[in-house]
C-alpha cells in the first residue's frame, strides 16, 4: 500500500513539474518566457501563451544559442536545428525562447542580412550583449521592434549596434542602469536617431566611440549622468548631425577625449564649463569640427600631454582663441602648471590679444603651437581711434603718441611684434603719452593697453 501511495505521489509531482515548465506570456504582453530551469528534451514545447491557439516553441540556452546564429545566416540551418520531427517548416524566430540564455555575444554579427522579428525574446537573464547586431560587412538589414526587451541585467553593450546601418527603432524605455560598457554601441549605426535621453547611464565607465559615425543621431542627451565615464575617445567622431547642448555634463572623471568631436561638423554648443582636469589626451578632439566656435579658456588642461591636431582645420574666432590662450596661460594658485613640451594645434585660429599669453606658454612650458598666426587686421594703419584713445603718427619713425582719457592713466601697455613676442612694455603716465619706438626694427607692431583691443601700427 505504501508503495502504491509513493508511486501516486511521484506521478502527481512529475505531472505538476511538467505542467509548471511551460511557455508563458510576460505581463508586458509581448515577451514569451520559459518557466523551467533547464532545456527540455526534445527542446520543442507546445503552448498557447499569446491566447491565439497552440504554437510550437523552441527552448534554447547558452549551449545551443549558436544554432540561432546559424539559422540567421542560413535558413537551411533552421531546418536542421529548429524543425520538429516529421515537419519541414522551421519554428519562426519569434518562437525561439531565450529565457535560459545569459550571454549573447555576437549573436547576429555574422548574419548581415538578418531581419526577422525577435521582439518577444526574453533577455531578462542576459548580462552580455557585446556585438549583438555588429557586422563587419556593413550590410546589416536588421530593423525590428525590440523596445519591450528587459535588458536590466545587461552590463556590457559594447558594439551592440556597431554598423547596424538599418536599425532605427524606439528603445527609449530600456533599463540600462546596470550597463558599464557602451563603447561603440551605436558606432556606424547610420540610421539610428531615437530619443534615448531618459536612459540611466550612471554606471557606464566606457563610452569610447559610442556614437562615432552615427551620422543621423541628434537627440537631447544633455541630461545624461556621465559622472563615472572615464573614456570618451571618439564619442561623437563623425556624428555629423549632432548638435545638442551637453554643457552640463559632469566629465570630471574622464581621462581620454581624443577624436571626441572629430568631423562632428554640426556641433557648436557651449562646453566651456566642463571640468577636464583629469583628461590626459585631447589629440584631434575638434579636428575638422568646422562649426565649433566656443570659448574654452576656463578649461583646466594642466594634465593634458597630447594635443596634436586638436583644432586641425578649425578656425575659432579671434576672441575665442584669445580666450583660450589667455585662460590656459593663467595659472590660479590652486591649479597645477601646464605639462611641458606639449604639441598643440590651434588649427586656422588667429590670435590678437592672446599674443603675450601664447608667447608665455611657449617660453615657460616649451610648447609647440601651430595656428593661423597673429592677426589684428580689423585695425587699419591710419590713426587708430576708439572712444578711449588714439595713436599717431602711424606709420611711426621714432616716437608713438597716445592720447587717451583719465581711465587709462597708470594702465600697463605692451607692444607685440609679428611673432607674438612682447618687445616693449610700460605704463601710460599721462593723458597724452609718448613711447620711444626708435629701437624697434621696421615692421608691423601691435599696441595693447590693458582692457582694450590691440592696435596695429607700422614702424618705419
Residue ranges, per PLM feature:
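Alpha-helix initiation and N-capping motif
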Residues: 3, 354-355, 394
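C-terminal outer-membrane/trafficking sorting elements
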Residues: 384-460
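Residue-level signal for beta-strand positions within conserved beta-sheet cores that form or flank
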Residues: 16, 41, 338-340, 365, ...
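Short small/polar-residue motifs
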Residues: 18, 27-29, 55, 324, ...
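Bacterial Sec-dependent N-terminal signal peptides
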Residues: 1-22, 381, 449, 460
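Negatively charged
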Residues: 21-378
Amino acid at each position: 500500500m505504501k508503495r502504491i501511495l509513493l508511486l501516486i505521489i511521484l506521478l502527481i509531482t512529475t505531472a505538476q513539474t511538467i505542467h509548471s515548465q511551460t511557455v508563458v506570456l510576460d505581463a508586458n504582453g509581448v515577451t514569451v518566457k520559459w518557466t523551467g530551469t533547464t532545456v527540455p528534451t526534445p527542446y520543442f514545447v507546445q503552448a498557447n501563451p499569446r491566447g491565439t491557439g497552440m504554437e510550437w516553441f523552441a527552448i534554447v540556452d547558452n549551449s545551443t544559442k549558436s544554432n540561432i546564429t546559424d539559422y540567421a545566416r542560413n535558413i537551411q540551418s533552421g531546418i536542421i536545428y529548429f524543425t520538429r520531427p516529421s515537419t519541414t517548416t522551421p519554428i519562426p524566430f519569434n518562437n525561439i525562447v531565450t529565457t535560459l540564455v545569459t550571454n549573447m555575444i555576437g549573436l547576429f554579427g555574422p548574419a548581415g542580412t538578418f531581419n526577422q522579428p525577435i521582439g518577444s525574446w526574453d533577455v531578462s537573464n542576459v548580462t552580455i550583449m557585446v556585438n549583438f547586431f555588429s557586422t563587419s560587412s556593413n550590410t546589416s538589414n536588421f530593423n525590428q521592434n525590440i523596445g519591450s526587451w528587459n535588458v536590466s541585467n545587461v552590463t556590457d553593450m559594447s558594439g551592440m549596434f556597431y554598423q547596424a546601418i538599418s536599425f532605427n527603432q524606439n528603445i527609449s524605455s530600456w533599463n540600462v542602469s546596470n550597463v558599464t560598457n557602451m563603447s561603440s554601441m551605436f558606432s556606424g549605426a547610420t540610421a539610428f536617431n531615437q530619443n534615448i535621453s531618459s536612459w540611466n547611464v550612471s554606471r557606464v565607465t566606457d563610452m569610447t566611440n559610442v556614437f562615432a559615425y552615427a551620422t543621423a543621431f541628434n537627440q537631447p542627451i544633455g541630461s545624461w549622468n556621465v559622472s563615472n565615464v572615464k573614456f570618451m575617445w571618439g564619442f561623437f567622431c563623425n556624428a555629423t548631425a549632432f548638435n545638442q547642448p551637453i554643457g552640463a555634463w559632469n566629465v570630471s572623471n574622464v581621462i581620454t577625449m581624443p577624436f571626441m568631436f572629430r568631423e562632428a561638423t554640426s556641433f557648436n554648443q557651449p562646453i566651456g564649463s566642463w571640468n577636464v582636469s583629469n583628461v590626459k589626451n585631447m589629440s584631434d578632439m575638434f579636428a575638422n569640427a568646422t562649426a565649433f566656435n566656443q570659448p574654452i579658456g576656463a578649461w583646466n588642461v594642466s594634465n593634458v600631454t597630447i594635443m596634436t591636431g586638436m583644432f586641425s582645420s578649425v578656425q575659432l574666432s579671434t576672441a575665442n582663441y584669445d580666450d583660450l590662450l589667455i585662460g590656459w596661460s593663467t595659472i590660479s594658485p590652486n591649479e597645477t602648471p601646464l605639462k611641458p613640451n606639449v604639441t598643440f594645434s590651434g588649427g586656422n585660429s588667429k590670435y590678437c590679444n592672446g599674443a603675450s599669453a601664447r608667447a608665455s606658454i611657449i617660453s615657460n612650458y616649451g610648447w609647440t603651437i601651430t595656428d593661423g598666426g597673429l592677426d589684428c587686421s580689423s585695425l587699419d594703419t591710419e590713426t587708430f581711434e576708439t572712444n578711449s584713445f588714439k595713436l599717431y603718427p602711424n606709420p611711426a619713425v621714432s616716437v608713438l603718441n597716445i592720447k587717451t582719457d583719465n581711465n587709462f592713466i597708470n594702465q600697463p601697455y605692451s607692444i607685440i611684434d609679428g611673432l607674438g613676442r612682447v618687445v616693449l612694455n610700460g605704463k601710460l603716465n599721462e593723458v597724452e603719452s609718448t613711447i620711444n619706438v626708435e629701437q624697434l626694427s621696421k615692421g608691423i607692431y601691435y599696441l595693447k593697453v590693458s582692457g582694450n583691443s590691440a592696435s596695429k601700427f607700422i614702424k618705419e
